Amino acid sequence: MSRIGRKPVPIPQNVQVEIKDGNCVSVKGPLGQIEKTFSPLLTIKKVDNQIVVERPNDEKFVKALHGLTRALINNMVLGVTQGFEKRLELQGTGYRARVQGNKLVLEVGFSHPVELEIPTGLTVSVQDNTKISVKGIDKELVGQFAAIVRSVRPAEPYKGKGIRYEGEKIRQKAGKAGKK
């Protein structure tokens, strides 16, 4: 059995879980509500105060799906109780960010500012013009938007200028040797 899939997902007291049509799971908590539809190959049940994911056989694909589904449901429960956050930092002279309405405006060395539409369900805040915080209840959406922001100007390996995740280490390269 999948070691992750075998573990039941505990449901906290302030969270309501509803399973519709056998494979559509709706989780409602203090921070909001998430609904996801999973593969019909698996059986999702609510037993006592836990969600149990079961699989019909031991095929490789079904085993992988088993662990994935359990992890996604666990992330849904964590999202509506604690929420998720990704932090990014801008490094480079004149690099700055700001939130304008429902857009994140990045000035990262291009001839024009880059505007990114903030998806519904996410809150983006900027501290000191160089630190961006992306928060939300859907882990996938938070990570995807943070990756889109980072892809605008990924940190380069020579000077380290660009957008990076907080705490991310950029491997520095030596420049050209030069003439002697």
Swiss-Prot record:
Superkingdom of origin: Bacteria
Pfam families reported for this sequence: Ribosomal_L6
Coiled coil: none
A single GO cellular-component term on record: cytosolic large ribosomal subunit
Signal peptide: none
Keyword set includes Ribonucleoprotein: yes
UniProt subunit comment: Part of the 50S ribosomal subunit.
Stored NCBIfam families: L6_bact
Chain's role: This protein binds to the 23S rRNA, and is important in its secondary structure. It is located near the subunit interface in the base of the L7/L12 stalk, and near the tRNA binding site of the peptidyltransferase center.
Full protein name: Large ribosomal subunit protein uL6
Organism, scientific name: Dictyoglomus turgidum (strain DSM 6724 / Z-1310)
Source organism phylogeny: Bacteria, Pseudomonadati, Dictyoglomota, Dictyoglomia, Dictyoglomales
